[in-house]
């Protein structure tokens, strides 16, 4: 099983994420088991970490925030997120890691 999968028509990308809030910067850091680990600069207070996550994903996938849906894990570090209608694949999350 992978940390991502596609819906039936490939316009839906489903991501399994492990989120670490309170980091120095927001970034994807690598695979952790069957999830992609993402560090968030935001703290997990009043939904700020979830908002930071959706903003990060929307920017990476070049879609509006409304196309990012948190399906599971609103109050957990383990999350399932759906990305709708992105022309980018899951590899865009690693673009910053390769640049370093």
UniProtKB/Swiss-Prot annotation:
Record's protein name: UPF0235 protein NE0395
UniProt cross-references to Pfam families, sorted A to Z: DUF167
SMART domains reported in the protein's UniProt record: DUF167
PANTHER family: UPF0235 PROTEIN C15ORF40 (PTHR13420:SF7)
Family assignment from sequence similarity: Belongs to the UPF0235 family.
Lineage: Bacteria, Pseudomonadati, Pseudomonadota, Betaproteobacteria, Nitrosomonadales
Gene Ontology CC: one annotated term: cytoplasm
NCBIfam families: DUF167 family protein (TIGR00251)
